[in-house]
UniProtKB/Swiss-Prot annotation:
SUPFAM superfamilies documented for this protein: Cytochrome P450
Organism: Aspergillus terreus (strain NIH 2624 / FGSC A1156)
Positions with a binding annotation for heme: 216
Effect of inactivating the gene: Impairs the production of acetylaranotin and accumulates chemically stable intermediates or shunt products such as haematocin B, haematocin, terrespirodione A and terrespirodione B. Also leads to the accumulation of deacetylhaematocin and demethyl-deacetylhaematocin when ataS and ataH are also deleted.
Known EC number: 1.-.-.-
InterPro entries: Cyt_P450, Cyt_P450_sf, Cytochrome_P450_monoxygenase
GO MF assignments: heme binding; iron ion binding; monooxygenase activity; oxidoreductase activity, acting on paired donors, with incorporation or reduction of molecular oxygen
Protein name listed in UniProt: Cytochrome P450 monooxygenase ataY
Pathway: Mycotoxin biosynthesis
Disulfide bonds: none
Pfam families from the UniProt entry: p450
Cofactor(s) of this protein: heme
Length: 228
């Protein structure tokens, strides 16, 4: 992320090629400082102290359900649980509620469990592959499985965005994180974010909500158990 006083521009690793051909432009990947500053100002409202405190009830409800499901031998995995996966279920449910006001019920149902490996694959394509494969047009030829899974992931993200936009148009849009993006107006043009920009931001919200927090919790659990 660019800080307010950053003097250097992000490298081509983030754009995966020329800026004008960048496929994914969001808070995490944009190299344009002006664009990044605008996006950071929008999302900062969702991360203010007051906002974070307002999330407490939702987070505690999910944690209580998480503990209940873990102690039930009849839930996913039987009496022995894969804690890495279970922390992913927990954080994804929290992300869904806070970002899209949608309960994915990852802790109680397996309908959305398919998204977990798709997120892993998408992250690998962005962070674990050589950018020149994209620049030279070789990625679709050499990374067939990853590219196919990326398309599935982007379709899934588009579906979540369409669902949230439909709620807003129906006058049922709750005060969640995505509402900040839907209500944003460009100061110069007065225009709202287009679908492509909304979908790109949804990518980073979904991945950050599930992937970055879950390993932290999992690591804390391991440290605590090893300290006993």
């Amino acid at each position: 992320m660019y800080g307010p006083g950053t003097k250097f521009e992000k490298a081509m690793f983030y754009t995966r090629g020329p800026k004008e051909k960048q496929l994914l432009v969001n808070l995490a990947s944009t190299t344009d400082k002006a664009v990044h500053a605008r996006k950071r100002r929008i999302i900062s409202h969702a991360l203010s102290e007051a906002s974070i405190r307002s999330y407490e009830v939702t987070i505690l409800d999910k944690i209580q359900l998480f503990c209940k499901q873990l102690s039930d031998a009849s839930t996913f995995g039987g009496p022995y649980k894969n804690m890495s996966r279970w922390f992913s279920y927990l954080t994804y449910d929290i992300m869904g509620q806070l970002t899209f006001s949608q309960s994915y019920d990852m802790l109680t149902k397996d309908d959305h469990h398919f998204i977990q490996p798709l997120i892993d694959s998408y992250q690998h394509s962005q962070l674990g592959t050589e950018p020149k494969l994209d620049q030279w047009g070789l990625a679709p030829l050499l990374l067939l499985r990853i590219m196919a899974e990326n398309k599935k992931f982007r379709r899934y993200v588009d579906d979540q965005v369409n669902h949230r936009i439909a709620l807003e148009k129906a006058g049922q849009g709750p005060p969640d994180i995505f509402k900040l993006l839907l209500e944003h107006k460009d100061k110069e043009t007065g225009e709202s974010m287009g679908f492509k920009e909304l979908s790109d931001e949804a990518v980073v919200l979904i991945i950050a909500g599930r992937r970055f927090f879950s390993p932290c919790v999992n690591g804390s659990k391991r440290f605590t158990l090893n300290s006993q």
